[in-house]
């Protein structure tokens, strides 16, 4: 029977959050780095993330869960979890849930387990295989959500072979780490949500054969110090699976763009980009080494197919390009906001107000001459910092 070899348990009600800055433990090459980087205490600026996303093959159902360790839930007495679900008729269930205790363990068989536990017994737990080929989540939050989510890697090789081999390969920007540990995954969900829609009735959500991905992130730096605009998407487009987080830097980092992006073809990794190039970013083009991406916002016009957000950023989609330096290989994907999932302000209302929006994305493209079609699950964010 497997026994815990390392354990990190934080109780937000027991002074585990401190004012003194802390540095994360060292990055481990060729590891998913699932165990907490701030295992004993966490500072008011530090944060850690374990995220799991899934959507069905038709782009009609989505379910996402983001588990955090940070100081944002101190007043609510818990570490927060953001849970969102979307049904085919457009009904959305989304809540921020709070859990006093966050516990993560590494076991002797190499597996990793996590539990976010509230004082009244509600919980969200995850269990991840030692080779990152499978993950299972269990939701047991009375009056909110119950059920399971499963993710199973379907790449041609073990996910461990595609993990970052160096500290630099794992960084979104200096001191900020984002990785996609599982690569392409097949997913399934069976869940029941309480108080859904205007009638407040319970409703079940099923995904029998879907796609998705996992995200692991951490930093000692708060988000406003390195970004004011971000976009994330995980998608399956024909034989391609793609996953990208792109940020536009705040004044603290001279407004530079940053990205972590991965592109798989038939389960094989073909692009692992941590560099951004773009029309408005040509001043940084000389920094390009190896794989790179360009993400361009599509603004609404009479030919627009996508939906627009409710805030200052009114784009209707993106053009995402993967490229290899000194190579003819390249892939282009057209992304259109197909269905709204969530929409929340991040500033005071008004014509210059900022916010965050979640989308089911309609995506098409591939290599030159290809036009595969598929879907993705993503979100964009702007915050009111220069």
UniProtKB/Swiss-Prot annotation:
Keywords annotated in UniProt: Isomerase
What results from changing residue 51 to A? Significantly decreases enzyme activity
Record annotation: effect of changing residue 82 to A: Significantly decreases enzyme activity
Q: What would be an example GO MF term here?
A: isomerase activity
Q: How does its activity get regulated?
A: 3-aminomethyl-p-menthane which is similar to the phomasetin substructure, dose-dependently inhibits phm7 activity in vitro and production of phomasetin in the fungus.
Q: What is the effect of changing residue 178 to A?
A: Significantly decreases enzyme activity
Effect of changing residue 247 to A: reported as:
Significantly decreases enzyme activity
Question: Where, in this chain's numbering, is substrate bound?
Answer: 51, 84, 356
Q: In which pathway does it act?
A: Secondary metabolite biosynthesis
Effect in UniProt of substituting residue 356 to A: Significantly decreases enzyme activity
Any idea of its EC number? 5.5.1.-
Mutation: residue 66 to A; reported impact is:
Significantly decreases enzyme activity
**Positions of the UniProt region annotated as Beta-barrel motif:** 223-386
* Effect noted on mutating residue 342 to A: Significantly decreases enzyme activity
Region Beta-sandwich motif: list its residue ranges.
1-223
Q: What effect does gene inactivation have here?
A: Leads to a significant decrease in the production of phomasetin.
Q: What does this protein do?
A: Diels-Alderase; part of the gene cluster that mediates the biosynthesis of the trans-fused decalin-containing tetramic acid phomasetin, the stereochemical opposite of the HIV-1 integrase inhibitor equisetin. The PKS module of phm1 together with the enoylreductase phm4 catalyze the formation of the polyketide unit which is then conjugated to L-serine by the condensation domain of the phm1 NRPS module. Activity of the Dieckmann cyclase domain (RED) of phm1 results in release of the Dieckmann product intermediate.
Protein family per UniProt: Belongs to the Diels-Alderase family.
This chain's protein is named Diels-Alderase phm7
Q: Which organism is it from?
A: Pyrenochaetopsis sp
Q: What is the lineage of its organism?
A: Eukaryota, Fungi, Dikarya, Ascomycota, Pezizomycotina
């Amino acid at each position: 029977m497997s026994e815990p070899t390392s354990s990190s348990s934080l109780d937000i009600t027991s002074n585990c959050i401190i004012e003194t800055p802390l540095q994360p433990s060292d990055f481990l090459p060729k590891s998913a780095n699932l165990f907490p980087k701030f295992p004993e205490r966490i500072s008011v600026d530090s944060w850690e993330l374990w995220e799991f996303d899934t959507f069905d093959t038709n782009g009609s159902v989505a379910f996402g869960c983001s588990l955090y360790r940070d100081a944002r839930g101190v007043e609510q007495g818990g570490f927060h979890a953001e849970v969102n679900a979307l049904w085919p008729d457009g009904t959305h269930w989304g809540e921020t849930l709070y859990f006093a205790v966050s516990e993560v363990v590494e076991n002797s068989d190499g597996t990793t387990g996590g539990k976010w536990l509230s004082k009244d017994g509600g919980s969200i737990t995850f269990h991840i295989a030692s080779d990152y080929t499978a993950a299972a989540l269990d939701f047991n939050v009375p009056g909110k959500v119950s059920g399971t989510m499963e993710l199973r890697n379907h790449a041609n090789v073990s996910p461990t072979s595609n993990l970052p081999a160096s500290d630099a390969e794992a960084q979104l920007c200096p001191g900020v780490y984002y990785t996609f540990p599982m690569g392409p995954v097949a997913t399934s969900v069976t869940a029941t949500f309480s108080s859904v829609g205007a009638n407040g009735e319970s409703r079940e959500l099923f995904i029998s054969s879907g796609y998705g991905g996992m995200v692991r992130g951490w930093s000692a730096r708060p988000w406003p110090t390195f970004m004011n605009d971000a976009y994330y998407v995980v998608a399956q487009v024909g034989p391609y699976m793609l996953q990208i987080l792109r940020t536009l830097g705040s004044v603290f980092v001279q407004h530079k763009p940053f990205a972590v992006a991965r592109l798989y073809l038939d389960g094989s990794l073909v692009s692992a980009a941590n560099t951004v190039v773009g029309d408005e970013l040509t001043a940084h083009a000389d920094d390009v080494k190896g794989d790179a991406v360009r993400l361009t916002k599509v603004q609404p016009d009479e030919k627009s197919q996508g939906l627009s957000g409710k805030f200052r950023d009114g784009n209707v989609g993106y053009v995402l390009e993967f490229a290899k330096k000194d190579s003819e290989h390249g892939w282009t994907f057209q992304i259109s906001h197909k269905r709204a999932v969530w929409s929340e302000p991040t500033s005071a209302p008004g014509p210059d107000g900022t916010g965050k929006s979640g989308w089911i994305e309609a995506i098409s493209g591939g290599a030159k001459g290809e036009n595969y079609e598929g879907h993705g699950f993503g979100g964009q964010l702007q915050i009111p910092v220069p």
